[in-house]
Amino acid sequence: MPEYPTEDTNASGKTSGSSPDDHTDDNAPSFFSCENLCIVQVPVSTGSLNGFSIGFVAVYMHLYEIFSGCSALESSGACSGNSKCTWIPNNSTCVWKDCNGAAGATTCKDGSGYNSLESGLFACSMIVGSMIGSIFAGKFLSKFGLKMSFIVSGVLGIVGSALIHVATRGSTLWVMCVGRFLMGLVLGLVCVASPMYVNENAHPKYRKTIGVLFQVFTTFGIMFAALLGLAIVKTPGHDKASGLLWRMQVFCSVSTALSALLLVLGLVVRKSKTSFAGGVDSAGEGVLDPNEYSVRQMLGPLAVGAVTAGTLQLTGINAVMNYAPEIMRNIGMDPMEGNSAVMSWNFVTALVAIPLVSRFTMRQLFLACSFMASCACLIMCGIPVYPGVASVDNRNIVATVGIAVFIAAFEFGVGSCFFVLAQDLFPRSFRPTGSSFVVMAQFIFNIMINLLYPITVEAISGGKGKSPEKGQSVSFIIFGIIGIICFVLQLRYLTPWEDGQGTSTSPTARCNAPTSPNNGEGEPATADMSPVEMSTPKHSGAA
């Protein structure tokens, strides 16, 4: 299988510093060729696992709420299938164990599902694991390589999935959290490794297209989880523990299968041609020195990367995903049906990014779409929802359209371009460290949103039990303002790393650096351009 060079070499064997995109498309294989599909399988498998793990939370919590509703169980066999329930032979009823046989069905229903603390632990366990995994991803990739990262991720994913199966059978929260934490470690590693593998090994003609597939299949995984959950709750017998338990196990088995697929991927995928000094694959030519640039030299790109992570998370994508089912409920839709509709729209809009990246630069898409998403948060999801601004009917319509616009803008450019930008902001030798930091930053912001959003909504709305419209409105106004601030900073400082620019790494210096119209030999100066800046096959619109 051919390996596409990332740098040109001259007669003396020294690198000329040219970008992969400087190579012509004459030797480009078909997109559906074997060698190209070998690269495509990486973002497809890793993105699907990432997406299903994200979509897992809302669906599983809903299924568990049904499963743990003891009063709905009508036989001793079904009741014994739930470790938190007990069967009362005298009146042939199933009650919550904490009821001690004295309480009625209404009290037992109060014990179904997770409480607020348990829900928080369940939701955040994977994100915390992802943050920790991304912290160590850079060192791990430099030492053991990309191929080994997929193998280790597959093994950890299988172990984590096995614990989730055990926790589902015994309704044990702490085992579930440990399993989700291990899955988080996997995702923290693959969110760095998968985009890096594509960046280092894909043919220049397809690098951006394949690069966005990680986000596209992340949205596919989220949608698949939502649709599978909808199918489960629409089948007869789903409200009985004896019938629901095996359905929940089937739902959990998707993560197991995807983790096994990741392990197989690690075993069969070819090694990346990029290796780092001090690593297990450091023999041979073209080895990169991970210590070529210090963190101090890279403070500028790292700061810009943190701002892009803020755009990804602090504009409220996770809050929108949580708020969307309630919006659908408000306009008369079933919550699970509404959730499936929103996640399907999320996937469809992500598909649009595939043709867009061949027409525009990553920078152009990211900037334009971040501005559009921020405006949607501020003007459509924020201000109109504030109590008294609009009637209830108009408010719901505008907010629903606003969420649709926000999701579309996010998937057109913000989500799809983020993981590619996390690579191209840094020189190749610094990418394990730089990309690891940027991905870690977005997980930190993710945790902040998951923890602070419900608290903020409740506090601004006047406390528990109050109508949430005021708190939701103010929250989305804040999201919009944060997005606008990030947009202004990125408009000034978001530029990809250019080979040969040396250590002038401050954002200001990089933005103000002059660009020569040619390379001294009458040819356009595309040699120093990163893939982020290659807007079209003719390189006609670098932003």
UniProtKB/Swiss-Prot annotation:
Q: What name has this protein been given in UniProt?
A: Glucose transporter HT1
Which family does the record assign? Belongs to the major facilitator superfamily. Sugar transporter (TC 2.A.1.1) family.
Write out the topological domains of type Cytoplasmic: 1-38, 142-147, 194-212, 270-300, 359-364, 422-436, 492-543
Where is there biased composition of kind Polar residues? 7-19, 503-519
TM ranges are 39-59, 121-141, 148-168, 173-193, 213-233, 249-269, 301-321, 338-358, 365-385, 401-421, 437-457, 471-491
Q: Where the protein is mainly located, per its record? A: membrane
In this protein, the residues bearing a glycan are: 90-91
Q: What subcellular locations does the record give?
A: Membrane
Q: Where is this region: Disordered?
A: 1-24, 503-543
User: Lineage of the source organism?
Assistant: Eukaryota, Discoba, Euglenozoa, Kinetoplastea, Metakinetoplastina
Q: How does it sit in the membrane?
A: Multi-pass membrane protein
Pull the Extracellular topological domain ranges from the record.
60-120, 169-172, 234-248, 322-337, 386-400, 458-470
